[in-house]
Amino acid sequence: MDKVLSFHQGRLPLLISMPHAGLRLSDAVRDGLVEEARSLPDTDWHIPQLYDFARDLGASVVAAEYSRFVIDLNRPDDDKPLYAGATTGLYPATLFEGEPLFKEGLAPSGEERKRYLEQIWRPYHGTLRRELDRLREQFGYALLWDAHSIRSHIPHLFDGKLPDFNLGTFNGASCDPVLAERLQGVCAEATGYSHVLNGRFKGGHITRHYGDPAKHIHAVQLELAQSTYMEETEPFTYREDLAQPTQVVLKQLLQALLAWGAERYQR
């Protein structure tokens, strides 16, 4: 499969991962989707555009090209569930609202899915591993920011309205607690926005697997409510008027992340 990811190598010890930004579909997935899924409603819409300042900041960036409807890059390759209750797996079978993703009998075959694992999932995770190792080798530490977004109202997954900024550190296991406090502080000072640490979204496979403070790799997931930068209904339009103030907070978060790293490791 061609062009399964995009990658930009930066100049600072920060890697931003965008595993759910992809829009491409395999033929088998496209042919099998129910009508409600054809607009790719569960995409982390416009995340590369929202973080377009990150390259100038000096971050490395890796982003998926294929949709999570093909394979979910934020799930382990053994498909072990990450959350209790309603969730989606390595090969999603349902939409976030709970309806079937594929028409009866038209889900991709086991052989097709094995191809997705080998040709999409493994290259993405290989890129993550190599870049984190390179950053740690060069700087003595590495910072991983797993960038996500989701609709603010999904009754099948969570009650009520999701906070705007949902920070996840796998209950403190994926990064230094002082770093988590710093990031919470940035969110608390952001007027007009709500936030939570380790609420409904505590960090998926990427945060849990790569975050290893004892080995000087600190990982944080941000699940951003899409209402902070776009229309949450079709055609899922990017709203510059909403996005600009949200980008200010995102930049402050990444700058706080980098400042903490430089202070902690005296670099």
From Swiss-Prot:
Stimulated by Co(2+). Fe(2+) is also a good activator, particularly at lower concentrations, but it inhibits slightly the activity when used at concentrations over 0.1 mM. Other divalent metals tested (Cd(2+), Ca(2+), Mn(2+), Zn(2+), Ni(2+) and Mg(2+)) are not effective activators. It catalyses: N-formyl-L-glutamate + H2O = formate + L-glutamate. Induction: Induced by either urocanate or N-formyl-L-glutamate. GO terms for molecular function: hydrolase activity. The keyword ATP-binding does not apply. It is an enzyme of class 3 (hydrolase). Its EC number is 3.5.1.68. The keyword Hydrolase applies. It holds the Pfam family FGase. Optimum pH is 7.5. Retains over 65% of its maximum activity between pH 6.6 and 8.5. Keywords: Histidine metabolism, Hydrolase. InterPro entries: HutG_amidohyd, N-FG_amidohydro. Pathway: Amino-acid degradation; L-histidine degradation into L-glutamate; L-glutamate from N-formimidoyl-L-glutamate (deiminase route): step 2/2. One of its GO terms (biological process) is L-histidine catabolic process to glutamate and formamide. Catalyzes the hydrolysis of N-formyl-L-glutamate to formate and L-glutamate. Belongs to the N-formylglutamate deformylase family. Monomer. This is N-formylglutamate deformylase. It comes from Pseudomonas putida.
